């Protein structure tokens, strides 16, 4: 409570971890200098720091914890380390000014990590192997997504209410060559997947009463759980 008026934080070079809720609710904090040896940012560390505008993580940071930057409403730019592997649940929840973050080296993104990041329009998930429920839900500007070449399960809520999903035509929505989900009411009697489709998502066409025939491509290597239940 005594730290709510903090405006700038410079951490010693030897610091390797910032503890949970360390700067929670420091609503006047504008500048944080991340030490070179820092390895992780714990849960809720900067949650509610509404005046933070940008953050650059040191090369040693591998983990961003649950709700670490939740509610940082003026945070517009985040530079992750090339070694950052994991983004925790709700890590950037309601960072509604965020428009730039480099995710190309991240392998795991937790549930709700970027919900309500309304200005985020472009992301690179090239090396991501795990995407949580609602990870990018209600990212209303999100239109450009670079997907990995091999991912075998993505929750069907992961990109709900994004421009990418809402602007897609009815039918099969692909994440690269991964058959992600059906958009709209699929009432055709035949379902045909495009060439080069390598996998079909879990729960892809559950409880559909219309499809009588499914054409699977030779490229297919995986069919998810309950895909056609």
Q: Can you annotate each of these PLM segments?
A:
Residues 1, 19-24, 42-47, 65-70, ...:
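Consensus positions within tandem repeat domains that build extended binding/scaffold surfaces
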Residues 3-17, 27-40, 50-63, 73-86, ...:
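Structural signature of tandem-repeat unit edges
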């Amino acid at each position: 409570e005594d730290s709510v008026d903090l405006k700038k934080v410079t951490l010693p070079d030897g610091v390797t971890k910032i503890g949970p809720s360390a700067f929670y609710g420091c609503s006047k904090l504008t500048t944080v200098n991340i030490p070179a040896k820092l390895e992780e940012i714990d849960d809720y560390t900067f949650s509610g720091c509404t005046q933070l505008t940008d953050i650059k993580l040191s090369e040693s940071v591998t983990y961003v914890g649950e709700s670490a930057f939740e509610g940082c409403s003026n945070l517009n730019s985040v530079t992750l380390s090339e070694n950052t592997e994991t983004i925790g649940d709700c890590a950037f929840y309601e960072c509604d000014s965020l428009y730039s973050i480099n995710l190309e080296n991240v392998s795991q993104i937790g549930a709700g990590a970027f919900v309500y990041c309304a200005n985020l329009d472009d992301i690179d998930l090239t090396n991501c192997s795990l995407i949580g429920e609602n990870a990018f839900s209600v990212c209303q500007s999100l239109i450009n997504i670079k997907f990995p070449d091999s991912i075998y399960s993505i929750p069907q809520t992961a990109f709900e209410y994004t421009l990418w999903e809402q602007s897609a035509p009815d039918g099969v929505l692909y994440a690269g060559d991964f058959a992600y989900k059906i958009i709209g009411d699929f009432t055709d009697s035949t379902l045909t997947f495009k060439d080069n489709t390598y996998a079909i998502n879990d729960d892809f066409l559950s409880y559909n009463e219309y499809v009588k025939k499914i054409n699977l491509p030779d490229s297919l290597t995986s069919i998810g759980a309950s895909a056609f239940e």
